[in-house]
A protein has these predicted regions:
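A structural motif shared across PLP-dependent enzymes of the aminotransferase-like
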Residues: 1-4, 99, 195-196
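Conserved PLP-anchoring active-site segment centered on the Schiff-base-forming lysine
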Residues: 35-57
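Active-site phosphate-binding strand-loop segment of PLP-dependent enzymes
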Residues: 70-140
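Active-site PLP attachment segment
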Residues: 147-185
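Structural signature of PLP-dependent enzymes
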Residues: 184-190, 208-230
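Conserved glycine-rich beta-strand-loop-beta hairpin in the small C-terminal domain of fold type I
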Residues: 205, 222-230, 240-252
Length: 252
């Protein structure tokens, strides 16, 4: 059902062998970092970021190298000069949470292409955390890094049932990549813990069959909440708050 979802919504042709179901996106991330990180490797990620990324990297001998951002610039980081300034000879990958947690930054098509070029030019892994992908506002259209064909061998997509379908207790996520060598490593790790809950997988299978109207209804509701919260927050003297373009977070 995950393959059908990607084909239906994004025109991406994943095969079942390109996907491993995990116990939430967190396990997908820990497996990914275990597979690609060697001691001393650095992972680029725009700051502020979901704090557990720091733990995921450190316990595997890697280090997070933050890309500084500013609220005044809307937390935007996908510019060639900013990316290259963070690059070192130890850089192994860049993580892109799109839309962002906790900034709500939604990357434009042009920004995604800049990141793709940077990844390919420097032979890096791109770890695309797309758990909030459908929830972009103000006329933006959802897009996956998987839509960028030239990233085929460099791209690792992390996804989650809990955010997209409000099913946090289900603990169902997955990792997707067309890089066969990477997926071989993921399969070995997955075999070490047998399997994810069968019952929860059955339920999640049906969630991925929901029509596009589901996302539109959820997006409309989240957008209303965002606008209402932003309007009240901006009444506070001297407050700094950038209206998020996606997800359901707001930095104040």
């Amino acid at each position: 059902s995950i393959c059908d979802y990607y084909k239906r919504e994004y025109g991406v042709g994943y095969k079942p062998t390109d996907i491993v179901v995990t116990m939430g996106a967190s396990e997908a991330l820990t497996m990914t970092f275990t597979t690609i990180i060697d001691p001393g490797d650095e992972i680029l990620i725009a700051e502020p970021f979901y704090s557990n990324y720091q733990t995921f990297a450190l316990v595997r001998g890697g280090n997070i190298r933050p890309i500084p951002t500013s609220s005044k610039e809307g937390y935007r980081y996908a510019a060639k000069d900013k990316l290259e300034a963070a690059l070192t000879d130890k850089t192994k990958a860049i993580v892109c949470i799109n839309p962002g947690n906790p900034t709500g930054l939604a990357l434009t098509t042009e920004e995604m292409d800049v990141i793709a070029d940077f990844v390919i030019e420097n032979d890096l892994w791109l770890i695309a955390d797309e758990a909030y992908r459908e929830y972009v506002y103000d006329g933006m259209k959802p897009r996956s890094f998987a839509n960028i064909d030239r990233l085929k061998e460099n791209l690792i997509v992390i996804d989650s049932v809990s955010k997209r379908f409000s099913a946090c207790g289900a603990r169902i996520g997955f990792v997707a990549s067309k890089n066969e060598e990477f997926m071989t490593g993921i399969i070995k790790l997955a075999q070490s813990r047998l399997c994810v809950s069968t019952l929860e997988q059955i339920g999640s299978t049906e969630l991925f069959k929901l029509p596009s109207s589901y996302y539109e209804e959820m997006k409309e509701e989240y957008c209303k909440r965002r606008d209402a919260a932003y309007e009240e927050i901006m009444k506070i003297p001297d407050v700094i708050c950038h209206k998020p373009g996606g997800a359901f977070y707001m930095m104040v």
